[in-house]
Amino acid sequence: MSERIIMDDAAIQRTVTRIAHEILEYNKGTDNLILLGIKTRGEYLANRIQDKIHQIEQQRIPTGTIDITYFRDDIEHMSSLTTKDAIDIDTDITDKVVIIIDDVLYTGRTVRASLDAILLNARPIKIGLAVLVDRGHRELPIRADFVGKNIPTSKEETVSVYLEEMDQRNAVIIK
């Protein structure tokens, strides 16, 4: 199986910086801004974007995580679900501008699950979506507001994102 490196470490760093600037422009600064990374790699990307925004604005914005495990539509819901546990952040996200962050946008089902988790717990003013890679093949009417790189793929190909925080390297690879 052949592999192609689509983004290396430097490209990922530049992309995270660009997305941070785009989010600041979209929100006209940092007021009421919240970042929520979808576990697991979205969490690391959210932290990187938070760090870039801090470098740019000298202000640290609230950042947390979304665990979509119990909101997926391809598994049965577990009765022990505590929906409040789906979002891990130290501030209320009601009446805030929430940016969901993930590594790859594919069918849209992960994003739909994250929207369910958010809206079950709060009522943000606005919700945006930032992804490192958009590979197409949507099954739901969902699109990202901030895209690092559009990578047209076939359904047979896989897009793998490697992040240093968990994979000891930074790369986006198509197999």
From Swiss-Prot:
Catalysed reaction, written as an equation: UMP + diphosphate = 5-phospho-alpha-D-ribose 1-diphosphate + uracil
Gene3D superfamilies: 3.40.50.2020
Pfam families: Pribosyltran (PF00156)
GO biological process terms, semicolon-separated: DNA-templated transcription termination
Enzyme class name: transferase
Transmembrane region(s): none
Free-text function comment from the UniProt entry: Regulates transcriptional attenuation of the pyrimidine nucleotide (pyr) operon by binding in a uridine-dependent manner to specific sites on pyr mRNA. This disrupts an antiterminator hairpin in the RNA and favors formation of a downstream transcription terminator, leading to a reduced expression of downstream genes. Also displays a weak uracil phosphoribosyltransferase activity which is not physiologically significant.
Assembly and interaction partners: Homodimer and homohexamer; in equilibrium.
Protein name: Bifunctional protein PyrR
Organism: Staphylococcus aureus (strain bovine RF122 / ET3-1)
